[in-house]
Each structure stands twice: as structure tokens, then as C-alpha cells.
Amino acid sequence: MTPTLTDTAASFSRRGLGVLRTAGAVIGGLGLAGIAAGGAALAWGSIERTMPTLRRYDVPIERDVPEVTILQIADLHLFAGQEFLLHFLSDVASSERFDMVVATGDNFGSLDAFDMVMDAYRPFLSYPGAFVLGSNDYYSPIPKPWTRYLMRSTPPPARVVPDLPYLPMVRQMRDAGWVDLSNASGTLSLPGGTVSLLGTDDAHIFRDR
């Protein structure tokens, strides 16, 4: 059997956002009809975000490289009422086979979500892992009205003082042996060999170096 690298990505992004972008591009020229379409798209986005998805990707690699299965966890944006995501992640941890975990940030959906975030990751911390942070690990989300898609608006001033408890989260992940790849490199030892990793902090908030 030819070795391949199997990248198993657990993506919890809102698939409805694709619909939102399409509707948003049309709304400006449709007046009230466009607003109605936008409302329908937003409603679908609200429904579909409750349906997390496990996606699988096969990445071809060199013949002599051992097969590795990577679980990626991204964009949880956790807040009260999303306990279904914790159940989903627990099911993934117990039913899927993977060799290592990569967490790519944006874990918080509210200021008080720290316990939920750590509960989400607890089933995975016994695996080799690495992580980077996203803007919603440093700064809590700012609610935005959907009408902002209809008109130009002045962007809010950039925040420079984090208000989310990212340091305790980072500490617990490091204590579990996970590698912090925020503007850093590192390695993970797997049964099939050593994996070299390189990461950056979030470029959208100018923390990459």
C-alpha cells in the first residue's frame, strides 16, 4: 500500500455563510426584495450552524513518508447554548481514528465560554497536538446588525487589549504537551516518526510575525 497523508479536518464553520455572501452581493440592488432574501439567508445560516460537519481530505505525499491522520479543530466560537458541539466533539474523539490534533483558533464566542472551550478540548488533550490562536481567542465577538450588509459603515476602532481568557487556555494546552505554534515552530513525536510544524499568530489582527 502506498503511504499517504490523510488530513481529516473537523470543520465547524457556518456553511450558511456561503449563502450569506451570495445574498449580500445581491441585496444592494434589490431593495426590499433583497432585504427579504437576506433575512432568509440569515435564518438558514442560523439553522445550519447547528449542524457541525466532519470533512475528510486525502493529501498525496512522498512514497516513503508514513501515513498520518490529522484532526483539525477550527472556529468553534463557543457560547452558552452550544452544548451540542461538545457532544459532537466527544463523539468524534471516541469514534474516529487519528494520530494528532491541530487546533487553528477562534474558540470563543463569548466572554464566559472558557469552561466550554476546555470541555471541548478535554477528550483530545491526551493526543499529540499543536495549536495557534485566532482573533476570537483574544477579543470577544462584537455583535453586528445584519443591516450592515446594506450600507457602508465606519469600521469600529481596533482593539489592542485582549478581553478573553486566552492565557489560561494556552497554559492548559501547553501543560498537556501541545505545541504552541503562534509565530513559532515545533515538532511532535508520533509512532511513525517526527512531524515538523510551523505556525503564525492571527494575521487579521496583525499579530503574525
Where are these regions (language model features)?
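Charged, low-complexity N-terminal segments of organelle-associated membrane proteins
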Residues: 1-10
